[in-house]
Amino acid sequence: LNGGLLNIDNIREFKKICEIAKQNPNKYMKVGLRVNFDVGNGLLSRFGLDSNSTEFVDVLNTIRNIENIELSGLHFHISRARDLESWKKRVIGMLSLVEKYKLDNLQYIDLGSGMYGRLDSELQEQFGNTPTYRDYAEIVAGEMSRFYANKGMKPILFTEPGTTIVSKYFHVFMKVLDIKSIRGKYFALLDGSFHNVGEICGLKKVPMRIKHICEGIDYQNVNFVGYTCLEQDVIYSGYSGELSIGDEVEVCNVGGYSIVDKPPFIHPDIPAYMQKDNQLICNKREQTLDDIFAPYIFEMTES
């Protein structure tokens, strides 16, 4: 009602916006629609409106019939579709909707996130030949430019490369607390957990550097595990090399979500530092037990 733009994900949200528009006929409301269609990556996303459904058509027709609601843009966002072919399908899919439903006055088209960013060499080898930002631009902006070449109104093209940009610059530092052997398999216990690293450690072997504190022993096929009681708390699988208790482990390329994904489980969250002018500056303090228990209400009863 105060000039913001509302991005609609589902029918319930749309109906609510229609009610608000009806109650405020003098207020002009701009909305965007998050759409959902297949880009061939094998993931059925739960987000957005199915662009092949009658519900989607009904939403478009309803917007056209309400004087104080304007469709300002289309939004598409999907996970695990970083390859160029998926990006080509998403931009062509969006432009097909523009053409099919004559959406000639859109102010923006948002293609969401999901690009490859700069990667450490260890990750680069696992992902193979990854596209550059220029590769994405040629595919996406190229299709947009050709489609809108002879059209009057040209929408703004948005992408959302958040983690794409920052992933390479987030590192987590941990320490080896113990090394144990179970039926011939070695495990190195760290003072961090997979929650500090993010889901990347379950998908790929994250880049890892070890600072040896003292002369260690050469191990084969060691799993680096976290301090939680969860079997899936594995940070790195299959390390071979020198290792000793007290060694410092640097886990690289851990992404942007790792700084917020850590639940208050077993240990409070770790602090965060940024490097500036060759100095470390704390920009997020260590979480305390008081922080964790602050939302809880403890009622004391007299015995």
What are these regions (language model features)?
Residues L1-Y108, G117, Y148:
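Active-site-proximal beta-alpha core segment in soluble small-molecule metabolic enzymes
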Residues V91-F158:
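Acidic, glycine-rich loop-and-beta core segments that form the ion-binding/anion-interacting portion
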Residues D83-R90, L119-R134, S167-K175, Y236-Y239:
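Short glycine/threonine-rich loop-to-helix capping motif typified by GTGT followed
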Residues E13-K16, E55-V59, E70, S86, ...:
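General structural feature for long, well-ordered alpha-helical segments within catalytic domains
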Residues G152-S303:
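Charged (often Lys/Glu-rich) extended helix/loop segments that serve as interaction or gating elements
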Residues G32-R34, H75, D110, F158, ...:
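Conserved beta-strand segments that form the floor/walls of ligand-binding pockets within enzyme
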Residues V35-V39, I78-R82, S113-G117, T163-I165, ...:
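Glycine-rich beta-alpha junction loops
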